């Protein structure tokens, strides 16, 4: 995608065969995490100025009025996977959700659903500090985070997707798959081969 220091052959091939938007920008977020707004915009089909309202509507809780419950149901039924399901698609999700609606209800099949970033890796944040030892290693499984469970989370999500393709191809219906990798987020952990490929 124009970068020369990062090897992205699959993205380059996909971009060359599809449509590229050179001036499509995320205008920000209503929180410190821009990804929250991006995910809500994708799933709700709303631009930034309407996505927060959709998020608030989806979040309405147990003490909601009948009117709020009806608004939530209407918003939920217009989520991207719901629309695709009504259009005859199989729908599948794996990875980072972080949306104010249950993924396992929005999609026909949902696996390994995670919220935001792992927060149990304090060694990976606010580092390195001057005159302090830095024991952090992005590929050391002992720090947990994206290594929680013994495999890198990206490998788990990728395997879910590949496994589902094997299942979906047995069905004549087309399928819609939403795969959301967490790894671009803190604490920025990766297998050693990738750390070695892109030294800092």
Task: Kindly label every feature range from the protein language model.
Residues 1-200:
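Formylglycine-dependent sulfatase
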